[in-house]
Amino acid sequence: MARNEIRPIVKLRSTAGTGYTYVTRKNRRNDPDRLMLKKCDPVVRRHVDFREER
């Protein structure tokens, strides 16, 4: 299997509407659905939800 098939690169976009993104890798076997993580958004200076963007 190729490296990118199991762990693709995904963008996590802020739900605060600032347009800030994080880039990470995800394991498709463990997380087949879209990721949602709480991370710091430096534009609004708060922890907000970041959702996977396709």
Swiss-Prot record:
Lineage: superkingdom: Bacteria
GO biological process terms, semicolon-separated: translation
GO cellular component terms given for this protein: cytosolic large ribosomal subunit
Keyword list, A-Z: Ribonucleoprotein, Ribosomal protein
Pfam families linked: Ribosomal_L33
Record field: transmembrane: none
MF (Gene Ontology): structural constituent of ribosome
InterPro entries: Ribosomal_bL33, Ribosomal_bL33_sf, Ribosomal_zn-bd
Family the entry assigns: Belongs to the bacterial ribosomal protein bL33 family.
Protein name from the UniProt record: Large ribosomal subunit protein bL33B
Organism expressing this protein natively: Mycobacterium sp. (strain KMS)
Origin organism lineage: Bacteria, Bacillati, Actinomycetota, Actinomycetes, Mycobacteriales
